[in-house]
């Protein structure tokens, strides 16, 4: 993969509540602060990323009588699905997100697109590969001129193994798994190892049939090969021991993080064993446990970030929300936490830049 090629990364865990949206948004913002041009794709019908970034503007981009497709991802996908003229691509920018970050906003209509996808008639026959690789086509249109390509595309996904997740993974170069400090995360990491090889095998079956019928068409040759790039530990707590100068992760979260690391090790072994046709895990991985970085529990900072449509790193530049009618001031501890989280996201961005090449 050439260094100037757009890197497409899905942020995925089939478990909910692991901060996929927050990580997608803030990692994209951190990559932009490193000078990278970033496209975020909200591919979750719940539209949390779009609402977080756009705030009060989000309802205005949804379909209306006058504009039946709106200016969300629906404008592209529905025209494609119904073969209705040229596909239209719209991008948006958040109120306070770095201006090198663009967003393709979500729409609840994504549920309709998901229902239109059939593994049997579209994928396994090879007749509907375009439907399952539509994200790749969307990115190609978003990139436009060769000189103006995105460095990174981050895709926010729903917490399931549904067809939307398949579609995103088939067009992704890498995927990153956010995890939280609970026993279910370790279990769900294992499920990825059981499910992803089947997804890849079914894509390969469809491609083989497509290539048999279209021997000179290599359109899909580089798709369907997502590589596990690592995991992010999110939401743990720290304490400062009396005899120590710095905070340490609390024992319970440390133990849980270790269990997740064990689950990730098994995931890597499973992927390498069951996917032989291409590399399935990062060869130039950041650590033995594929650990990309940690994000301490953000507590009320997350609520303020969502209410103010502001990435964590910029919260110290605006007043916090005490309630919907009153503004307060950040406490010294909160300002320290914002600074630390900013550093954490930049560190993860640096590892992504170094290893996802």
Model-found features: residue ranges?
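P-loop NTP-binding core
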Residues: 1-357
């Amino acid at each position: 993969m050439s260094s100037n090629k757009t890197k497409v990364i899905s942020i995925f865990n089939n478990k909910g509540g692991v901060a996929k949206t927050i990580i997608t948004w803030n990692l994209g913002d951190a990559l932009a602060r490193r000078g990278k041009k970033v496209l975020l794709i909200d591919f979750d019908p719940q539209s949390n990323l779009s609402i977080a970034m756009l705030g009060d503007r989000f309802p205005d981009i949804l379909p209306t009588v006058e504009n039946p497709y709106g200016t969300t991802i629906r404008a592209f996908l529905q025209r494609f699905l119904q073969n209705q003229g040229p596909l239209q691509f719209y991008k948006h920018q958040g109120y306070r997100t770095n201006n090198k970050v663009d967003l393709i906003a979500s729409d609840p209509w994504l549920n309709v697109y998901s229902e239109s996808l059939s593994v049997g008639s579209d994928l396994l026959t090879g007749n509907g590969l375009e439907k399952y690789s539509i994200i790749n086509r969307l990115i190609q249109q978003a990139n436009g001129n060769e000189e103006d390509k995105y460095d990174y595309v981050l895709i926010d996904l729903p917490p399931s193994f549904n067809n939307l997740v398949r579609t995103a993974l088939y067009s992704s170069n890498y995927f990153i798994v956010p995890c939280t400090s609970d026993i279910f995360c370790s279990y769900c990491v294992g499920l990825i190892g059981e499910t992803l090889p089947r997804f890849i095998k079914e894509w390969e079956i469809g491609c083989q049939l497509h290539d048999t019928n279209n021997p000179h068409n290599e359109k899909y040759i580089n798709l369907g090969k997502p590589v596990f790039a690592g995991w992010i530990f999110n939401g743990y707590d720290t304490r400062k021991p009396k005899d120590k100068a710095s905070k340490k992760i609390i024992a319970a979260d440390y133990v849980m993080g270790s269990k997740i690391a064990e689950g990730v090790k098994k995931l890597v072994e499973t992927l390498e064993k069951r996917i032989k046709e291409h590399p399935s895990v990062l060869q130039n991985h950041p650590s033995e446990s594929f650990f990309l970085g940690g994000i301490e529990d953000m507590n009320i900072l997350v609520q303020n970030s969502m209410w103010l449509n502001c990435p964590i790193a910029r919260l110290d530049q605006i007043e916090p929300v005490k309630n919907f009618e009153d503004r307060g001031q950040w406490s010294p501890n909160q300002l320290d936490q914002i600074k630390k989280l900013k550093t954490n996201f930049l560190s993860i961005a640096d590892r992504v830049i170094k290893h996802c090449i």
